[in-house]
Structure formats: C-alpha cells, structure tokens
Amino acid sequence: MINEKSSSAIKSQINAEFYSAYLYLDFYNFYVEQGLDGFANWYQVQAQEERDHAMLMMQYMQNNDLKVTLEAIEKPNLKLSENMDPLREGLKHEKYVTGLIHNIYDAAYSAKDFRTMQFLDWFVKEQGEEETNANDLIKKMELFGSDPKSLYMLDNELAARTYAAPSLVL
C-alpha cells in the first residue's frame, strides 16, 4: 500500500509536471516569435514529455486505487527577452523538479514504500537526463549563439528532435 505522505507528494507533483509543460509551451511561443522554429520544436517536445510524466503519475495513483484531483496550473511569470533566457530558466526549472522528485523519493523511503520508490527510479534517471540535456544546450548556445550561421545550424539541429513516448510501463 502506498503511504499517505508519498501519495500526497505525488499528487502535488502531477500539478508540477503539468506546470512544466505549460512553462515549456511558453518557451515554445517565445522561440516561434523569434523565428527560431528548431528551438520552438525542442520545447514543444519537452512540453509533451512533461505532460506524459504527469499522466504516468496519474496512472500510478489510479492503478493503486487512489483518487487524483487536478489543481489549477499557475501561469508562468517570466520576462523572456534574449534567446538564452528560456534555456537558463529551463535548466533552473529542471533542477527544481529534480528536487521535488527527490523529496517524494525521500518520503517513500522513510515510509518503506518500496513500490513507490521503484516507480520513482525511472523519474530520478529521467531528471538526470533532463538536466544534462538542458546544460548541453546552454553550452552550445554559449559557443555558437552569437554567430548567425552557427545559430541557424543549431536551430536546424533542434528542429530534428522528435517526440518519443516514455519508456516507463506501469
């Protein structure tokens, strides 16, 4: 049986994952307005992934006969003016989400909620990948972003990213 503290934290995390999708759609809009469709694509795929994370958590709760109530999603309140802004904010946000996932894991560990710990293992790994990808993108932008030709090539690289459904099976 899932511990109450674990289930409460997962319910909050569902909202955080939907917020992440909403935030990344805001970044998507920013890059569309800048004419950087590849960067926009990268964040559109990110938004899809975050939505999937929320859905996986909802399914986990439902598979364990726990009720899920959706909460309001807060509007992102960021001032984006430079092409680097969404990248930096994205990395900052991924680090924040990693902390949230670790807090849920800690709650499950304290309660000896092994089922939830096993479920969260995938998310812990996923967050490591998310932070690495965000950091790598920042490094590329720092190297190439000021040169229009290089920015064009980086934008084309990001345009090639496609959505892949999560590997976690419940």
Language-model features, listed with the residues they occupy:
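Iron-associated oxidoreductase/ferritin-like identity signal
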Residues: M1-L170
